[in-house]
A protein has these predicted regions:
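His/Asp/Glu-enriched, well-ordered alpha-helical/loop segment
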Residues: 35-127, 147
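Short glycine-/acidic-enriched loop or helix-start segments at secondary-structure transitions
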Residues: 16-17, 76, 133-134, 152-153
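Short, compositionally biased
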Residues: 135-141
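Short hydrophobic/aromatic-enriched beta-strand-loop microsegments
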Residues: 5-6, 90, 141
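Small/polar (Gly/Ser/Thr/Ala-rich) solvent-exposed segments
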Residues: 130
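Extracellular/periplasmic ectodomains of large secreted or surface enzymes and adhesion receptors
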Residues: 14, 144, 148-162
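Active-site gating loops and adjacent loop-to-helix segments of metal-dependent hydrolytic enzymes
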Residues: 1-47
Length: 162
């Protein structure tokens, strides 16, 4: 069937694990985010149901893509972690977040590292196939083949480079 699932799992939210964000978000804003996310019993209850559905559809061969309605750039990390918690392998989640999503959106020059495509990628300090949370350990960012000056961007926008 020509069916694609873009899960939006109601996981614990980024507010429950914010230590890694301390260099990019002001402390007062972090506290507000934590307060807004702390008690979400309905979301936590529905996570189990949605995780079972995602796992079953994945096993049945339905194409799984990637997306989040989180407005923060770090929400993608949490969504990948939630997809692994739901039963997908880190390799399946990475494929969904990169090549599968690019294919779904018909953006042919991104999504995989292949000669002739735009060289947009990140370099990690640890293997995300071993632990999906390693996607947070970003060493370098490349856009169209050029390294991004993360420290310069952080200084320019009032935050840290990490």
């Amino acid at each position: 069937p020509n069916v694609v699932l873009v899960p939006n799992l109601p996981g614990p939210g980024v507010a429950l694990d914010l230590g890694w964000l301390s260099g990019t978000v002001p402390a007062g804003q972090l506290a507000e985010m934590q307060a807004a996310q702390r008690d979400r019993p309905a979301a936590q209850e529905s996570f189990g149901i949605q995780a079972r559905n995602l796992n079953r559809l994945n096993r049945e061969g339905i194409t799984i893509s990637f997306g989040t309605d989180g407005s923060s750039p770090w929400a993608v990390h949490q969504e990948m972690e939630d997809m692994v918690r739901a039963g997908m392998s880190p390799a399946e989640v990475i494929a969904a977040a990169t090549g599968t999503s690019a294919d779904l959106l018909e953006i042919g020059d991104i999504g995989t590292i292949v000669a002739g495509k735009s060289a947009d990628f990140i370099v990690l300090d640890a293997n995300p196939l071993d632990d999906i949370t390693n996607t947070r350990q970003i060493d370098a960012v490349y856009l169209r083949g050029s390294a991004i000056d993360r420290e310069g961007l952080g200084a320019r926008f009032g935050g840290a480079s990490q």
